[in-house]
Amino acid sequence: MIQPQTYLNVADNSGARKLMCIQILGASNRKYAHIGDIIIAVVKEAIPNMPLKKSEVVRAVVVRTCKELKRKNGTIIQFDDNAAVIINQEGNPKGTRVFGPVARELRESNFTKIVSLAPEVL
């Protein structure tokens, strides 16, 4: 469950390291974002000499959450950190690599490009 003011790790090589969520896209009164949801975030920490700079506002899709996710078959999946992948306006990732595992629910949310770049899909 990601809410405004939540810090997330960046799971790609776009140049940012940490993001802070400032808004969840969808309904106007939405309080939480889960895996596969698009958020608007601000870059809080960035790698030097990269395209993304600190205090830049970006769109990102949540790929991992600490809050457990219950699937229809009864299994529960939980990650060690909150992480997101930065995307452009069309929904394609800005980076060329994705680090760490991602959830299978991203495929149902039409983020197949992120799923194909990920080293492991859980």
Swiss-Prot record:
One of its GO terms (cellular component) is chloroplast. InterPro entries: Ribosomal_uL14 (IPR000218), Ribosomal_uL14_bac-type (IPR005745), Ribosomal_uL14_CS (IPR019972), Ribosomal_uL14_sf (IPR036853). Pfam families: Ribosomal_L14. GO terms for biological process: translation. One of its GO terms (molecular function) is structural constituent of ribosome. The keyword Chloroplast applies. Keywords: Chloroplast, Plastid, Ribonucleoprotein, Ribosomal protein, RNA-binding, rRNA-binding. It is found in: Plastid, Chloroplast. The keyword Nucleotide-binding does not apply. Binds to 23S rRNA. Part of the 50S ribosomal subunit. PANTHER family: 50S/60S RIBOSOMAL PROTEIN L14/L23, LARGE RIBOSOMAL SUBUNIT PROTEIN UL14M. NCBIfam families: rplN_bact. Belongs to the universal ribosomal protein uL14 family. This is Large ribosomal subunit protein uL14c. The lineage of its organism: Eukaryota, Viridiplantae, Streptophyta, Embryophyta, Bryophyta.
